[in-house]
Amino acid sequence: MNIHLDKYGQGMPLVLFHGWGFDSQIWQPIIPYLKPKYQIILVDLPGFGLTPMMDWESFKKNLLDQLPDKFALAGWSMGGLYATRLAIEEPARVQYLINITSSPRFISDVDWPGVAEEVFVNFYNNLSKDINKTLKEFISLQLNKMKFDFKIGNPPSPEGLAFGLEILGTWDFREQLKQISIPTVYLFGRLDPITPAKTMAIMEKNYPNFKYVLFNRAAHMPFLSHTDLFITMMDEFIK
């Protein structure tokens, strides 16, 4: 069972995991900026884009069979949970970990900032009614009304959306994250309504060996709203 990949450029392999509700095409606007330095590998996660539904173990095995021996790995939002889990379980393969407006746990807890689970449930309900309209509205909010023409090529399957919702609600890597010794960076947007910027202060205390970057004027999609700053950060981090 193959994972759908798109590859661009040559150089250090950089694998990109998209967020919930989207597919790998969300990365297209930044490919021209990354292509001169990296071999970009876009991945459709299970139930999204052209990748069929499968559980974590099947996804991991099939994906690793298709990837180079070593690679840098970046995950946006839900993709950050996938990226973090892969880095924890396969430290010999993942050389760098970049988490973009993501955290080891998405749902708020007594001592952990996050979002209420209802936020994702409401988003799920809206996606089920009109996916392109919902995603366009979401992007518009995150980019502060900046014009961005996005149309999803292959709508996510209902199973993919439901599985993603389960991941966002249940995956929690706060303890396992302490095992990670590879270079790791977390990027936050000060205006992000989904991964609160105050998460950064708690993470800096709990995981002092990681690097942290705060985009002062960004929300949940700094790679699109502040592409130049994002590319500069990537180039400085991946040596």
Curated annotation (Swiss-Prot):
Keyword Hydrolase belongs to the record: yes
Major enzyme class: hydrolase
Record-listed substrate binding positions: W20, S77, M78, F138, I139, S140, L141, Q142, H220
GO CC terms, sorted: cytoplasm; membrane
InterPro entries, per database record: AB_hydrolase_1, AB_hydrolase_fold, AB_hydrolase_sf, BioH
Highest rank taxon of the organism: Bacteria
Keywords: Biotin biosynthesis, Cytoplasm, Hydrolase, Serine esterase
Active-site residues (renumbered): S77 (nucleophile), D192, H220
Biological processes per GO annotation: biotin biosynthetic process
GO molecular function, one term: pimelyl-[acyl-carrier protein] methyl ester esterase activity
Compartments (UniProt record): Cytoplasm
EC numbers, comma separated: 3.1.1.85
Residue ranges crossing the lipid bilayer per the database entry: none
Subunit structure, as described in the record: Monomer.
Summary of the function given for this chain in its UniProt record: The physiological role of BioH is to remove the methyl group introduced by BioC when the pimeloyl moiety is complete. It allows to synthesize pimeloyl-ACP via the fatty acid synthetic pathway through the hydrolysis of the ester bonds of pimeloyl-ACP esters.
Entry's family note: Belongs to the AB hydrolase superfamily. Carboxylesterase BioH family.
Protein name: Pimeloyl-[acyl-carrier protein] methyl ester esterase
Biological source species: Legionella pneumophila (strain Corby)
Organism placement in taxonomy: Bacteria, Pseudomonadati, Pseudomonadota, Gammaproteobacteria, Legionellales
